[in-house]
């Protein structure tokens, strides 16, 4: 019984990895059909549906992975780091680095892979970015409490500016077919971003 469940879990993971790889390839800029995905995995479409009731559910699983990866790591940064500037830098670098290491998933983060899918999926990505923006706002607000001096610019504006930078770099990565890595020149870019945080 345990072997059967392990085999099923492994097949599910194989399906999700194949979908992520297809999103990373030139297929990712077009609608991915279950027929193409089944061929990529080496199973029938019926076999896909034994593991996932729909393609939407496959995307849901990838989005869950993205959410868990980013939110868990952001929480670790907030737990381990106390300096506001360091926290912000590491969160931004985390988002950019995650996108760079997972190009197929970056197509989901930017919405490109979801254009042909259910609107609900884009809503989940929107909620993820709202959660991240809320965490950035909280970090910005806590500066006064932690360091005795706060920012003079509206925290909402600063948080949205940081997130817009991340989204822009991820979009550029996708648009360039993954040539322009989001973390390229980050050490030179960050002082420009940090200078806006006043």
UniProtKB/Swiss-Prot annotation:
Residues 10-70 form the HTH tetR-type domain. It comes from the Bacteria. Keywords: Cell cycle, Cell division, Coiled coil, Cytoplasm, DNA-binding. It is found in: Cytoplasm, Nucleoid. Residues 33-52 bind DNA. InterPro entries: DNA-bd_HTH_TetR-type_CS, Homeodomain-like_sf, HTH-type_TetR-like_transc_reg, HTH_TetR, NO_SlmA, SlmA-like_C, Tet_transcr_reg_TetR-rel_C_sf. GO terms for cellular component: bacterial nucleoid; cytoplasm. PROSITE patterns: HTH_TETR_1, HTH_TETR_2. Residues 117-144 form a coiled coil. It holds the Pfam family SlmA-like_C. GO terms for molecular function: DNA-binding transcription factor activity; transcription cis-regulatory region binding. One of its GO terms (biological process) is negative regulation of division septum assembly. Homodimer. Interacts with FtsZ. Belongs to the nucleoid occlusion factor SlmA family. Required for nucleoid occlusion (NO) phenomenon, which prevents Z-ring formation and cell division over the nucleoid. Acts as a DNA-associated cell division inhibitor that binds simultaneously chromosomal DNA and FtsZ, and disrupts the assembly of FtsZ polymers. SlmA-DNA-binding sequences (SBS) are dispersed on non-Ter regions of the chromosome, preventing FtsZ polymerization at these regions. This is Nucleoid occlusion factor SlmA.
């Amino acid at each position: 019984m345990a072997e059967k469940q392990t085999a099923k879990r492994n097949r599910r993971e194989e399906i999700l990895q194949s979908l992520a790889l297809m999103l990373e390839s030139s297929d990712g800029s077009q609608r991915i059909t279950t027929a193409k995905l089944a061929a990529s995995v080496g199973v029938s479409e019926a076999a896909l549906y034994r593991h996932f009731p729909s393609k939407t559910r496959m995307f849901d699983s990838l989005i869950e992975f993205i959410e868990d990866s980013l939110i868990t790591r952001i929480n670790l940064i907030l737990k381990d780091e106390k300096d506001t500037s360091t926290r912000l830098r590491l969160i931004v670098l985390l988002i950019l680095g995650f996108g760079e290491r997972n190009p197929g998933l970056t197509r989901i983060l930017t919405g490109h892979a979801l254009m042909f899918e259910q609107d609900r999926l884009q809503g989940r990505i929107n909620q993820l970015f709202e959660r991240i923006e809320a965490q950035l706002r909280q970090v910005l607000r806590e500066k006064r409490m932690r360091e005795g001096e706060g920012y003079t610019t509206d925290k909402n504006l600063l948080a949205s500016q940081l997130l817009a930078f991340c989204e822009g770099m991820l979009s550029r990565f996708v648009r360039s077919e993954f040539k322009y890595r989001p973390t390229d020149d980050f050490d030179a870019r960050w002082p420009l971003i940090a200078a806006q945080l006043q």
